[in-house]
Swiss-Prot record:
It comes from the Eukaryota. It is a multi-pass membrane protein. This is Uncharacterized protein T02E1.7. GO terms for biological process: Golgi organization.
Length: 269
């Protein structure tokens, strides 16, 4: 079978899927996206003493201030996730979640490890997709077609979507390890090929769907924390962060690549 025919059929299938699931896909995407924040908030809640000691020992903070800092992060993570899921003050809630991620990168010194840093940048990109998706779904006034076109908002959402496409796929870069087998190296090369397509905004929905499917399978097979006792916390952390990246890809399928993409340029040509 001609490869162009296969690609066209895959594109048609993805476009049909995006249309048929336009009401439920954003909800699934948001649910997967906030999973890492819920898990993080619950982990802080049930291990408050350990985190308070971490801040006190590593940063020399007062015990009560360390406790206050931990409680604030718990509230931000859990209530921010709840508000996002309820579509209540999405932009503000996303900003709170993004600020909390930034604070954790500093407080836990995650910037010293590329594996953790790239994953957190990927999660921030997924949060930005929440903002872009919320802007795109804002109701338009009844006489919107008769009003002058607001170019500013379209430009903002397009910039957000372009930035999200680039940063979201950093999750894949974090999967590279020096002790990888040849099979995993081959899988990474294939996934990086799809990642470049998403970066460029070329056949974005199809490639985002393929990446989301691949990441889901990768996550279930290699981050099965329910079957492992050793390094449980690290594997569980990777599992939920990968889920959030998948949620971001599902939102990208729903929103589309935006104006700054090859897909949109092809339409203008």
């Amino acid at each position: 079978m001609d490869i162009n025919v296969v690609i066209t059929r895959c594109e048609d299938y993805t476009e049909t899927l995006a249309r048929n699931t336009r009401k439920v896909l954003p909800t699934i995407g948001r649910l997967l996206l906030i999973s890492t924040f819920v898990e993080d908030g619950l982990r802080l809640l049930f291990n408050t003493h350990d985190h308070v000691n971490h801040f006190s020992y590593n940063w020399g903070l007062n015990y009560h201030f360390s406790l206050f800092l931990t409680i604030v992060m718990i509230i931000n993570l859990l209530f921010g996730s709840l508000f996002v899921m309820m579509r209540y003050k999405v932009t503000e809630s996303s900003a709170v979640l993004g600020f909390t991620i930034f604070a954790q990168v500093i407080l836990y010194q995650l910037y010293t490890t590329y594996h953790l840093l790239t994953r957190n940048i990927s999660i921030v990109a997924a949060i930005m997709l929440l903002v872009a998706e919320n802007m795109l779904r804002k109701p338009k006034p009844a006489n919107y077609t008769q009003l002058p076109r607001d170019e500013h908002e379209i430009e903002v959402t397009s910039v957000l979507l372009a930035a999200c496409r680039v940063c979201l796929n950093l999750m894949l870069i974090s999967m590279v390890h020096f002790d990888m087998s040849y099979t995993r190296i081959l899988l990474c090369i294939i996934s990086y090929g799809m990642m470049i397509f998403v970066w460029l905004g070329f056949k974005t929905r199809m490639m985002s769907f393929m990446l989301a499917t691949w990441l889901f399978a990768y996550n279930i097979v290699l981050n099965d924390f329910w079957n492992k006792d050793a390094e449980l916390h690290i594997i569980r952390y990777d599992f939920f962060q990968t889920l959030s990246a998948i949620g971001g890809l599902l939102l990208l399928i729903h929103t589309g690549p935006g104006e700054f993409s090859f897909d949109e340029l092809k339409k203008k040509w």
